């Protein structure tokens, strides 16, 4: 039997999957690991799904349902202040496919892409899968986990760098980049003629701040490629529906690539997506307010316990320092799971600069978070 490809063997193992598998198998475990809403998909969308299933299913157009792309244009103009046409939009199987096909369509072998570190665990492997080179941009707690543009500029190789990936609001950090820093990053992208890949999966889950889309900035139409998903805003994770908006030439190339990978996003999901974009924002706001309540509680408890944690302003994660207790974040998470039955994600899942930290998700009901914090406190007291 032939072996496994070198490409696959060089991919990092997803530690998060192993830990969460153990959490599912042991009913005593409280998991603060999930990266998905704990809410049901809104009832109007569930009811509509049942209705359209009876109409049958067929393959869809590779670029996506035209009615959905029109609805996305309206949403982008209203919510994100991004001007677009249906030709600038590709509907995908979640934002992860959007990220992957954008890299496939824009990068050649050995091109470099700057990725945030700590950053969403998909970025580095996605870049490597297209035989390009991820260049980690260190984010620091003492800088508020905000991108340092001087450090960013120093990483750029005029011949090799082709793009920068940013994520606002951030997974795992919860940071929300303001307009000023986005304008500085945008100026760098224009100066060096780079794509600015903007992952905005958590755009609707912002607290105390305002979400700004880089694609709304003046003069960025030919540079910004923005990724969105229905998973977080509408609790539609299982529908696998997302979309990307960017320069028309690149989007057409992405459509060609996507055609040979998935053919099209699920047609049922796309029809539900049209319905979702017509819904009242009250459904998203109910989730956002509940996450906000949990956010304030868990951050206060983590700091009381002795795990320094900055207040996140978006998404539904905290990123806490544990280096004063144990240098190895994976060992800390593994021991916490084994001894205290609490599952968290080690910071190294998000890059080497995540060492010494753990990520907790507050996409878990508050009563469980309270129990998990009590268990964590007992665990930490034994470590001190």
Model-found features: residue ranges?
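Active-site phosphate-binding strand-loop segment of PLP-dependent enzymes
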Residues: 135, 139-208
